Amino acid sequence: MKLKFSYRLKKTLLRAATLFCAVSTAVAMTACSDKGETSTVQLSPKETVEKIFTLAKIKDYDSLAEYCRSFSKMSMELYFTDTGTDYDAKWLSRYSATLASIFDNYVTYDNLTEKADKETRTGSVTGTFTALDMEKFNEKTDSKINSEFKNDYNAQMDYIDSVIGDKEFKSKEFEYTIEFKYVNEQWTLTDKNFLILLTLGYYNK
């Protein structure tokens, strides 16, 4: 099964299960939540991004669901459904743990700057990020997975988990702009799968 996460980890972590993409957004939304709810706290776009990273680091996925999809089993399931990725529900816990490990090892942010215009109901946060370098990751793991673990999903995931943490798979710093909409008197992300795709290096162009 090939975890299809990053429309490119789609090859390796969900590749490994089709990994989430090989391991684990894309629609405009008015609420960034697994339950369709929005945060009751009125944060600016920059404060929202900082809050998301704080909650992700402490693994408070229930609170994080008020802002965007995270690394919970429910988020993984919704992400796979959104992206048309085949997955086996019994492996959701493992997908979640692997993606959380990728976040812990590779994702950083710095130099956040904000633009917010309530009149046009648009906002953005631009920053410097690092994430998983999916191209390098796939180059390193594809051959071994296909030759040695092709029909053994457990072995694929064990191998993937064993190489997460290698510094060579951390991307160089890249700039990215996170888009927001002002809806119902609060700022919400336009991309509900932002955190998952950032983690998988999808925005590192």
Task: Give the residues covered by each predicted segment.
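Core segments of small alpha/beta cavity-forming domains
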Residues: 36-113
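C-terminal or late-domain output modules
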Residues: 32, 40, 70, 197-205
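Bacterial N-terminal signal peptides that target proteins for export
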Residues: 3-19
